[in-house]
């Protein structure tokens, strides 16, 4: 946000909360394509292979306001440059520009709201791994969870209407609405059979902002009910909700259900209720009974349908018992298992041995899902046998090794908090042998001959930082190295789940 401060001070319109003039500023689109602002740090930044013009972007925005701009035939669309091969390029530029502009007031409000609060290293709470220590502390004492698949809004207008209470600049909202409808119509004209959604990977930033803004409208109700039904008001709930691409308004709670509010508060009064969300999947955990969780299930469905115009069905919400079922959340298989701890107690001449069960929140690497992802990315077969990757065979040897090594390190980095790391070493074996097969295919050699040629330098590319530390202390103290190997480490610099398919 420091980069935006200098520009915003020059715009008098910003002092009056007018965002519309920023849309025609070229530096906004330059910031949108800045690699420093790209929050997907684990994904490769791919630059555009074609040149683009900011002047064309302004002309496209102006064209949206012209009358009869939707009356276009198929022949006219083929002759138009924008409806040609550069359509996706410029539409993505406008969508990213919109996302940057609308994010500015939300980010500044969030920073100002946190100024008086004693939250240490708030940016660390944006990390995905910040959720897992919270789950370890809370979920081991709970019984049931609601595994919720959050429904998508059925209409674009619902997303736009959500911003009306946040952004008072009417021209910006009108332009955003025009762009969303216009882009939807362009895709329907060009691709009659294959409909391209506006929420594609090319427009992911704008979609995430609109989607999270919509979800926050009813997630703020959870914070409201929680604070009203409990005397111990949590200060971390707002921080956990205000994650990446997500800006909350904790001080401006929504006034809803005035008539039935006392009944709802009695229903929601549960001091052991916890809520966590990542993207379109959320978890509502409680120490209550199955009957209470079933009431929560139908309450959420009615809340979405009656008050937020979002269609949902009860079958999208599953009730799971933590001690019996595993939870598939954020790439981990999690459950609560009992560990029997033997305790010996001695009183005078008599001694007793007791087995004390201790609940522990366990996180496991889903090896089947990982193999499926590696298969989709063409690193191995369905059975997990490594294969070469012909797409990368034209690269330099150093680039091939670096790519495979980076994927391996990223996976180890993300799954460092797993309680069972044996599956990770199977993944490392697949990636390492796939790398060798790719190099052998490029040089038309055998795998055995190429392994002798590479030597130990090749293996160092696949070493993680944790393994390097273990190798240094292994010869000195074996017990310490074993504790580090079994230890669970959660990093606070990971803000997205890495998708292997993006490396194809």
Curated annotation (Swiss-Prot):
It is found in: Plastid, Chloroplast. Usually encoded in the trnK tRNA gene intron. Probably assists in splicing its own and other chloroplast group II introns. The keyword Acetylation does not apply. It comes from the Eukaryota. GO terms for cellular component: chloroplast. It comes from Simmondsia chinensis (Jojoba). GO terms for biological process: mRNA processing; RNA splicing; tRNA processing. One of its GO terms (molecular function) is RNA binding. InterPro entries: Domain_X (IPR024937), Maturase_MatK (IPR002866), Maturase_MatK_N (IPR024942). This is Maturase K. HAMAP family: MatK. Pfam families: Intron_maturas2, MatK_N. Belongs to the intron maturase 2 family. MatK subfamily. Keywords: Chloroplast, mRNA processing, Plastid, RNA-binding, tRNA processing.
């Amino acid at each position: 946000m420091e980069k935006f401060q200098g520009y915003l001070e020059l715009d008098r319109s910003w002092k009056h909360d007018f965002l519309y003039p920023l849309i025609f500023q070229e530096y906004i689109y330059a910031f949108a394509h800045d690699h420093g602002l790209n929050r997907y740090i684990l994904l490769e930044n791919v630059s555009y292979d074609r040149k683009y013009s900011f002047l064309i972007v302004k002309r496209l925005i102006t064209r949206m306001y012209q009358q009869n701009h939707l009356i276009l035939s198929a022949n006219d669309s083929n002759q138009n440059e924008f409806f040609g091969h550069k359509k996706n390029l410029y539409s993505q530029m406008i969508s990213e520009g919109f996302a940057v502009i609308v994010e500015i007031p939300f980010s500044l409000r969030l920073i100002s709201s946190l100024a008086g609060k004693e939250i240490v290293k708030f940016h660390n709470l944006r990390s995905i791994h910040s959720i897992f220590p919270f789950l370890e502390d809370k979920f081991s004492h709970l019984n049931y969870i609601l595994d919720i698949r959050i429904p998508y809004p059925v209409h674009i207008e619902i997303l736009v209407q959500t911003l009306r209470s946040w952004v008072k600049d009417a021209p910006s909202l009108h332009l955003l609405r025009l762009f969303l409808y216009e882009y939807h119509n362009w895709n329907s004209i060009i691709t009659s059979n294959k409909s391209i959604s506006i929420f594609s990977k090319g427009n992911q930033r704008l979609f995430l902002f609109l989607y999270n803004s919509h979800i926050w409208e009813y997630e703020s109700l959870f914070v409201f009910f929680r604070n009203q039904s409990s005397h111990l008001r949590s200060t971390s709930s707002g921080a956990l909700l205000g994650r990446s691409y997500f800006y909350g308004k904790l001080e401006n709670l929504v006034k809803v259900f005035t008539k039935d509010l006392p009944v709802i508060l009695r229903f929601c009064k549960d001091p052991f209720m916890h809520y966590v969300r990542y993207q379109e999947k959320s978890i509502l955990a409680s120490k209550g009974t199955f009957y209470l969780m079933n009431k929560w299930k139908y309450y959420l469905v009615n809340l979405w349908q009656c008050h937020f115009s979002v269609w949902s069905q009860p079958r999208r919400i599953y009730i799971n018992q933590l001690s019996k079922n595993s939870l598939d959340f954020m790439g981990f298989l999690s459950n609560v298992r009992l560990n029997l701890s033997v305790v010996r107690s001695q009183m005078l001449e008599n001694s007793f041995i007791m087995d004390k069960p201790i609940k522990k929140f366990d996180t496991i690497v889903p090896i089947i899902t990982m193999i499926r992802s590696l298969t989709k990315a063409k690193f191995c077969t369905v059975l997990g046998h490594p294969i070469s990757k012909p797409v990368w065979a034209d690269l330099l040897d150093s680039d091939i090794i670096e790519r495979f090594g980076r994927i391996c390190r990223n996976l180890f980095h993300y799954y460092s908090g797993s309680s069972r790391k044996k599956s990770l070493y199977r993944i490392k074996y697949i990636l390492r042998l796939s790398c060798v097969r790719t190099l052998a295919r490029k040089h038309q050699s055998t795998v055995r001959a190429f392994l002798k040629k590479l030597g130990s330098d090749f293996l160092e590319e696949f070493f993680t930082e944790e393994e390097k530390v273990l190798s240094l202390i292994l010869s000195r103290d074996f017990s310490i190295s074993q504790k580090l190997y079994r230890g669970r480490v959660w990093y606070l610099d990971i803000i997205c789940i890495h998708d292997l398919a993006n490396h194809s």
